[in-house]
UniProtKB/Swiss-Prot annotation:
Role of this protein: A GTPase-activating protein (GAP) that modifies Der/EngA GTPase function. May play a role in ribosome biogenesis.
Keyword terms: GTPase activation, Ribosome biogenesis
Basic residues compositional bias, start-end: 10-19, 31-40
An example Gene Ontology biological process: ribosome biogenesis
Coiled coil: none
Protein name as annotated: Der GTPase-activating protein YihI
Bias kind Acidic residues: ranges: 147-159
Organism of provenance: Escherichia coli O81 (strain ED1a)
Pfam families: YihI
Length: 169
């Protein structure tokens, strides 16, 4: 037995229904209305464009008429080659100023404290400390200062104070 052909058509896929004249006319009117609406809304340039396109998060909408503020050269500009400036040497400080800088150097103080605490420094740090201490010695000799003079003066003052005390004012 053959299955009936009428049953197979109805179960497979339904036949597309033809639209009536009224439905076709309504769709034509809708298409015509949409065609008239194409393009930008009137006044969109001055008003700042479409306000529903995510301007909710911005406080002030950006004016589309305002462009870049970078100046544009109007004529042919000559290429300017930059001349490399020679690196200027460090400004020469007076020996007194250089000595003050070295004495107040935080890195030098920290490394000297580590040395006094008994820590061993790396070769690079040790050489840096040696260079700085040598420079301090040179500057003190130039200025006529020495650590020994300060200690001797303090000892002299202590001896004078002792003598005054022994004499009994």
């Amino acid at each position: 037995m053959k299955p009936s052909s009428s049953n197979s058509r109805s179960k497979g896929h339904a036949k597309a229904r033809r639209k009536t004249r009224e439905e076709l006319d309504q769709e034509a009117r809708d298409r015509k209305r949409q065609k008239k609406r194409r393009g930008h809304a009137p006044g969109s340039r001055a008003a700042g464009g479409n306000t529903t396109s995510g301007s909710k998060g911005q406080n002030a909408p950006k004016d589309p008429r305002i462009g870049s503020k970078t100046p544009i050269p109007l004529g042919v500009a000559e290429k300017v080659t930059k001349q490399h400036k020679p690196k200027s040497e460090k400004p020469m400080l007076s020996p007194q100023a250089e000595l003050e800088l070295l004495e107040t150097d935080e890195r030098l103080d920290a490394l000297l404290e580590r040395l006094e605490a008994g820590e061993t420094l790396s070769a690079e740090e040790q050489s840096w400390v040696d260079v700085k201490l040598d420079r301090i010695d040179e500057l003190m000799q130039k200025l006529g200062l020495s650590y020994d003079d300060d200690e001797e003066e303090e000892e002299d003052e202590k001896q004078e104070d002792m003598m005054r005390l022994l004499r009994g004012n």
